[in-house]
Regions:
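Charged, glycine-rich active-site and insertion segments that engage polyanionic ligands
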Residues: 1-54, 58-134
């Protein structure tokens, strides 16, 4: 019961977090993050903002799963992405910062910020936040 937007968003999200996770000290992955940012920046502003909202939901769902609140988890990935393997990386020490950074990025995009720069900056922050210890 997924919309085509959700499927596309999930594909973008999975690619983004996998690349960001590898990017720490990895020059090629940083270049891939910039390319990812350029791709998303080429979409319309409303699509970018909707995608960032989708990311917020995805991170929240992962955290709920991490804290064993399985009955609150409604996200069913359509890709081969395993939420259960991703969940341990989203916890109390990074969820607030992740949500805050996503909201700030959406605000900057809404205020006509350069999407490529906003998304590249967000991607670099994501790399750091994914490696935050629980």
């Amino acid at each position: 019961d997924h919309s085509s937007d959700e499927e596309e968003f999930e594909t973008w999200f999975v690619s983004w977090v996998r690349t960001a996770f590898k990017a720490r000290g990895n020059k090629k992955a940083i270049i891939d993050l910039i390319a990812w940012s350029e791709n998303i920046a080429s979409k319309g502003r409303e699509t970018q903002k909707s995608f960032l909202g989708y990311c917020e939901d995805f991170f929240r769902q992962a955290m709920l799963l991490n804290y064993n609140a399985k009955e609150l988890v409604y996200l069913q990935p359509v890709t081969q992405f395993e939420l259960a393997k991703f969940a341990p990386f989203i916890h109390g020490n990074n969820i607030n910062s992740l949500i805050e950074e996503l909201q700030t990025a959406a605000y900057h995009i809404e205020r006509n910020g350069n999407a490529k720069i906003v998304l590249t900056d967000l991607s670099i922050k994501l790399t750091r936040l994914l490696h935050t210890k629980a």
